[in-house]
Amino acid sequence: VANGQGITLGTLALVDGTGLASNYSLNSASLNITERVLNSSGSKTYDANTNALAGAITLSNLVSGEALNHSGTATISSANAGSYTITNLAGITIADGSGGTASNYTLTGGTHNFTVNRRVVGVSGTRLYDATTNAVASDLSTHTNLVGTETLNLSGTGTIASKNVGSNKTVSVGTLALADGSNGGLAANYTLSGGTHQLTVNQRPLNATLSRQYDGTTTSAGSDLSSFDALQGGETLFLSGTGTVTNKNVSSGQSVTLGTLALDATGATALVSNYSLNSASLNIIQRPISTVYLTKLYDASTTVQASDLQTMSNLVGSETLTLTG
């Protein structure tokens, strides 16, 4: 850059215009070299501020083979995701670079564009096995890579490849969608595209109810199973092994010490690995006396007395009972 530099005329010559060149002579010439106007462009990921750092900006319109260094911070008009013109370049300083002299260039008057890209969000969470491949928004409560204290809301349903229990299963986005949250969190500044989305499916705990007739023991066998409280999707399971209760007598809802009681999928439609046995309770119901034999001498009456008892069947072990009335 210079003003009024003398020019060695070389082959410079006058030619006819509206006048005749022969009426004039070229005595001298001078050249003003002005600064070359630089353009700039850049981008960053949304970070909730209006800074455009030099490291995110690329200079253009340099003379071929020349390069410049630049440093500092420019400003854009909004922190939100979108395309902007840099409004304040005063904070950017250009310096000599490889083959390039800073004084030959200026940022003033150029075209300066800057893009703020959406920030990629990851979502993850945990739920109990439910016999589906759904990953609903309410199960994906952890949102990562948000700026500062910003929060977002999530709606919709994604999917996982397998319904079965497992850790960190990849979630396909499906209809999952971000919505504005709190502390300045705007959905338009974020995207699920390209994020890491994971769901852990844990075993669903089952509580078993067992029922049997009084048998004089405190044993509760898997074959006494009456029902489970939380099987999913119409699935079936059974029990094997034995547990114990503290009271052998007729009762309802006695807590069972599980012992060797275990979930058993033999002949069932469910996988044992998708469930855990949390607890069991036992209902002991009265044992019916199937036959009572009474004998009496003919006495011309239709009365049968308890004292006529001879035997009872279906009693447990050596237990005995008497009749009255």
Question: Which functions belong to the PLM regions below?
Answer:
Residues 1-325:
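Short loop/turn motifs that initiate or flank beta-strands
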